């Protein structure tokens, strides 16, 4: 593999976590491992993941639609702040103005999803909050699974450590565009997320 110029992407065992303890009461786990949806904007998942290179770190916040696995919105920042999470949700909410949908928004128990700003955004837009059970990673497995595949596919044959922060940001953005529009999935009948939504949504 070395002769062919192929570099193995080694996933780091330590995973970024925004959990800072039970800062406020958690809402019920409505999703409860059911990551299916019968229509677009019925059920959303959200999470933040860390991407590190030699020049520093970037944090990717996403909202993923359970109907077709599409990344509805995303934001990239140099810090995992509440603003990063809120801006991601605000961007997704803008797309609801063309519909009557009021999705469930499911997250882990991280601090970003328990601050007043996040709660106000969900309440003001009549979204239904759902949170994973304490210490139960599988409760948001669909979102975490996306990040795992992304870190493998996005940096296949490339070393993330060698990228600058600007290059890393471009890689992340380009991957999401490719994933939404071109990455076919067996679970979607050989269609990409956008193709599936346009045909069946």
Identify the meaning behind each predicted range.
Residues 52, 75-98:
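Active-site beta-loop-alpha junctions of metal-dependent nucleic acid enzymes
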Residues 123-125, 151-201:
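C-terminal domain-tail junction helix/linker
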Residues 27, 41, 60, 81, ...:
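Hydrophobic (often cysteine-bearing) scaffold residues that line and stabilize catalytic clefts
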């Amino acid at each position: 593999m070395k002769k062919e110029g192929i570099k193995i992407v080694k996933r780091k065992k330590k995973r970024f976590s925004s959990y800072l303890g039970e800062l406020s009461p958690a809402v019920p786990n409505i999703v409860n491992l059911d990551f299916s949806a019968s229509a677009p904007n019925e059920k959303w998942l959200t999470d933040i993941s860390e991407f590190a290179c030699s020049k520093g770190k970037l944090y990717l916040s996403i909202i993923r639609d359970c109907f077709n696995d599409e990344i509805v919105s995303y934001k990239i920042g140099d810090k995992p702040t509440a603003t990063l999470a809120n801006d991601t949700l605000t961007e997704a909410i803008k797309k609801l103005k063309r519909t009557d949908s009021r999705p469930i928004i499911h997250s882990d128990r991280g601090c970003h999803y328990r601050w007043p700003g996040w709660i106000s955004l969900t309440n003001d837009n009549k979204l239904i909050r759902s949170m994973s059970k304490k210490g139960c990673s599988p409760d948001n497995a669909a979102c975490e699974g996306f990040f795992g595949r992304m870190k493998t596919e996005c940096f296949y044959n490339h070393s993330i450590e060698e990228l600058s922060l600007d290059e890393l940001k471009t890689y992340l953005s380009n991957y999401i565009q490719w994933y939404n529009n071109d990455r076919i999935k067996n679970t979607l009948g050989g269609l990409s997320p956008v193709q599936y939504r346009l045909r069946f949504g």
